[in-house]
Amino acid sequence: MMTTLTARPEAITFDPQQSALIVVDMQNAYATPGGYLDLAGFDVSTTRPVIANIQTAVTAARAAGMLIIWFQNGWDEQYVEAGGPGSPNFHKSNALKTMRKQPQLQGKLLAKGSWDYQLVDELVPQPGDIVLPKPRYSGFFNTPLDSILRSRGIRHLVFTSIATNVCVESTLRDGFFLEYFGVVLEDATHQAGPEFVQKAALFNIETFFGWVSDVETFCDALSPTSFARIA
């Protein structure tokens, strides 16, 4: 059954049961003091409201029959998957650079099995959800995401999480090039960097690559009364 989500720059109509909520990298690394972003000098002090909003969005999406996909960014504990000096990721990843500057952190940041890699305590995948590891910013790169979505007839993706200007935007952009409709819930996302990069990322998304809405509006669009209005 179709519903219409009020969004910028215009409303978008979608079928929740042929859509997915994407929770990108809600790991201790990105949202918890003592995690990678915090240790690398980024401000994570305002992530708690974002976590609460993601909980709300996940609950509403699950009740409406949307697929929930959780991403965890990181690599094996030897960082082979991160790429060596021949990879730009080796040179640009702030996690890898932080560990080179602080050798005592080696093996602790974004390593599979570590506390840093784990999802935050408040967000727990449920049976029927899909949890995917990813080795780079985009959730489409070297993962089965595209085939998972296509095999289920899913064309609409609703994005939450951290960081808006890095992994969220990278995944949404790649989805745009693969003919997916991407929506970001702005109050369920958080940037890596100053506030202006959040605004810049959202501007890019709503102007060039997708749509921007918020959690309250999203939940309202998934309510039974909204389906009744469309019907």
From Swiss-Prot:
Highest taxon listed in the record's lineage: Bacteria
Catalysed reaction, written as an equation: (Z)-3-ureidoacrylate + H2O + H(+) = (Z)-3-aminoacrylate + NH4(+) + CO2; (Z)-3-ureidoacrylate + H2O = (Z)-3-aminoacrylate + carbamate + H(+); (Z)-2-methylureidoacrylate + H2O + H(+) = (Z)-2-methylaminoacrylate + NH4(+) + CO2
Active site: 25 (proton acceptor), 134, 167 (nucleophile)
Membrane-spanning residues: none
Induction and repression of expression: Up-regulated by the nitrogen regulatory protein C (NtrC also called GlnG) and repressed by RutR.
Keyword presence, Hydrolase: yes
Documented EC number(s): 3.5.1.110
One Pfam family in the UniProt entry: Isochorismatase
Keywords: Hydrolase
Family membership: Belongs to the isochorismatase family. RutB subfamily.
Job of this protein: Hydrolyzes ureidoacrylate to form aminoacrylate and carbamate. The carbamate hydrolyzes spontaneously, thereby releasing one of the nitrogen atoms of the pyrimidine ring as ammonia and one of its carbon atoms as CO2.
Name this protein carries in UniProt: Ureidoacrylate amidohydrolase RutB
